Amino acid sequence: MKLNKRSILFAAVILLITTLIQCGVYVTDYYRADRDAIVAFQQHQTVTKQVLSDNTIAYVPHDAKQGIIFYPGGKVDTAAYEPLASSLSEQNIAVFLVEMPFHLAVLDADAADGIQDQYPEISSWYMAGHSLGGTMAAYYLEEHHESFEGLILLASYSTYDLSQTQLNVLSIAGSEDQVLSWDQYENNKIN
């Protein structure tokens, strides 16, 4: 009986260690930004990048009246979205890229909290996100839709019913996207 308990305990410890190693490998294996692309866009950007906190990068033009809070896709480096943020800021739109724990927006869906309060001069706010980030942006809007004009989804969909809100929704997906679950995308269009 004693041997059996030891064997079970040993197996449980091995299983726990294996699981922890697999989790560590999973969260450290993510899509990184192309450094050459980052360098190329930095040479031409006109709006200065600001680091607001440990988890938020901002591109805020001087007279911006519109702001976008952007949640990155699952396991995608936040820096990969900096060229997009810089381009939008050149159109006089403030963009806030929120870095997520372990590159997973599901771990901090409320990361947008407090950003709007820091910029009272911005009158129109939008949430945006790519892939998992878009789904979590929609989740955030389920509770905070009164303070936003709309939602922008890039290769994403809302699993939360926002149809009874006044939000404008823009959904963009590439026809050759082989990562997006097209069945889920179609099934959730109603939301």
Kindly label every feature range from the protein language model.
Residues M1-T48:
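N-terminal membrane-anchoring alpha-helices
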Residues L84, L180-I190:
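Short alpha-helix in the alpha/beta-hydrolase fold that links the catalytic acid
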Residues K65-G73:
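Short beta-strand element of the alpha/beta-hydrolase
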Residues A85-A105:
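Conserved alpha/beta-hydrolase
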Residues A128-A137:
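Gly/Ala-rich beta-loop-alpha elbow adjacent to hydrolase catalytic centers
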Residues S147-S158, N168:
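A conserved short beta-strand
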Residues K49-K65, I115-E121:
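Short beta-strand-to-loop junctions in surface cap/lid or active-site-entrance loops
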Residues T165, S171-A173:
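Short beta-strand/loop motif that positions the catalytic acidic residue
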